[in-house]
């Protein structure tokens, strides 16, 4: 299996020490978000690769050489300020972290996500064009692939409409973004791609590809993986991964996040984290049913 660490919360940013404790002990327990009494026990001997997804990869860097599994990084890096990404650290530090990671695991294993693209009076198309070009310039030689997506109508987006103040992205916006982003990427030796987007931007120079394709999964593990996206009803063809995260436990508090939408619950869960526990949040009870997961 390939571990997703994590699409539900930013384990790398806030819980790296816990993850390394689990790695050293050889297993991790994951509570089923839809049936909380069920717990999957995952042994790292059954793990073929690890995909780290984070807005702040800095805390995990010191541990990377200890991890004897193939690693992929998806690092989200946008031009948004604290009004949208409330607790995300200084972007200059993140960029330096990306460079360090690229040197450690290789440029082909590091993906940057400019994600999601949203338009309002502050974050105009012109703003994004300039921010994306600056990003490409700073990461030239350290990143080959940048993934973009456009904002989706998640629960948290609806709850934060007073903050986001979204404007509709029309075809003219898509064309300008596509042409300008593609030009910036090419000038800095990168490829810009989309995944699970209904709009076809290939005519503007984007590549339609998957965040974790069957080809890439085979390259890093030597195994064939079936398509197993949880994003039903989309054009996503990413391979199946196993997420070990926990919803509503990320203190980044990004206004557009799909996985963290209850601020009170986020604070409670964060306080219920124990770095020595086998679970990310909380502890195992007598009523829990633990089953080993192999794939």
Would you name each region that the model predicts?
Residues 80-88, 116-126, 161-169:
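Surface-exposed cleft-lining segments at the edges of enzyme active sites
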Residues 172-237:
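A C-terminal junction/extension of Radical SAM enzymes
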Residues 8-10, 55, 76-80, 115-117, ...:
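Active-site beta-loop-alpha junctions enriched in small/polar residues
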